[in-house]
Amino acid sequence: MLCDSIESFFGALGADRRILGLDFGEKKFGLAVSDSTGTIAMPHSVYLRRNVRQDLGELNAILKREGICAAVVGLPLQLDGMEGEMCAVVRSFVQKLIKKSGVYVYLHDERFTTAMASRTTESLGLRRKASQKVDDKISAALILQQVLDMAKGRGII
């Protein structure tokens, strides 16, 4: 089910709030997972995309293996806040993910998370090539953590 607000998203979840964070890219996905209280987002992995069918199968396997029933997916809005072509691709993929896995999904503005992830890896002293291997999963963790923090700030969790 696609949730249109943080309130409806967290309202649909049970006590165990393990949530997947997904930074959607054309070539790869960055993945993050929250703890069971839905408080802390941790980078999980980077998945190299193959095709939609295999991508959905792999995500569904991760959801089952990790005991996850919900996902926060980054929505790549343009700088002016408008939706571009990539947003339509993300929305289409999310509908297929919901159909296959039955997860609750909340779409969250992901503007600037990749830049924030790059600055984080730079501050850790990682070289560019090494940082490119982790930037996507750090971006996914940032997207997920932003939503967790917003929910906490609103007294939802």
From Swiss-Prot:
Its EC number is 3.1.-.-. GO terms for biological process: rRNA 5'-end processing. InterPro entries: RNaseH-like_sf (IPR012337), YqgF (IPR005227), YqgF/RNaseH-like_dom (IPR006641), YqgF/RNaseH-like_dom_sf (IPR037027). Coiled coil: none annotated. The keyword Cytoplasm applies. Keywords: Cytoplasm, Hydrolase, Nuclease, Ribosome biogenesis. GO terms for molecular function: nuclease activity. GO terms for cellular component: cytosol. It is found in: Cytoplasm. Signal peptide: none annotated. Belongs to the YqgF nuclease family. Could be a nuclease involved in processing of the 5'-end of pre-16S rRNA. HAMAP family: Nuclease_YqgF. This is Putative pre-16S rRNA nuclease.
